[in-house]
Amino acid sequence: LCNSGVRWLSKAPPNKTLEEMWRQLDEGAELFSDLWNADVPCLAIENPVMHKYAKERIRNYQHFAQSVQPWEFAKDEAGPDNVKKRTCFWTRNLPNLTKTGTLDGSTARDEIHKAAPSKDRWKIRSKFYPALAAAMADQWGRAASITRQELTC
């Protein structure tokens, strides 16, 4: 679904066919659609920036509510969160995250974009960051709890 993978839709990677790549896109879009259209009061879906082929396959697609960078939640220049990796959130009945970090982004590492090709590159690029995860749990956990109370009253 993400921009970084769109190139595989015109030239498949080794050991894959274009048909397989388009089928995987359809499966990913179907999963996103099922989550996005779920009948739940509060919802957050995380994904990188999407390409146009994904957007046109997602039922009731809407633009993401917010995009953030891990460094916006970092407090230590040498810490694991001081990196550049744009992450988008599609949300329902949840507020945008408030940035909790103290850094300005000028020292943020771009190790994700510069990761050398390797068998583990996918793991490096899939990493999620602890300060961002903590902000999600804290801020959205409180908001979802309040929403749940309002819906049951």
Question: Which role does the model predict for each range below?
Answer:
Residues 1-153:
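Conserved active-site and SAM-binding loop architecture
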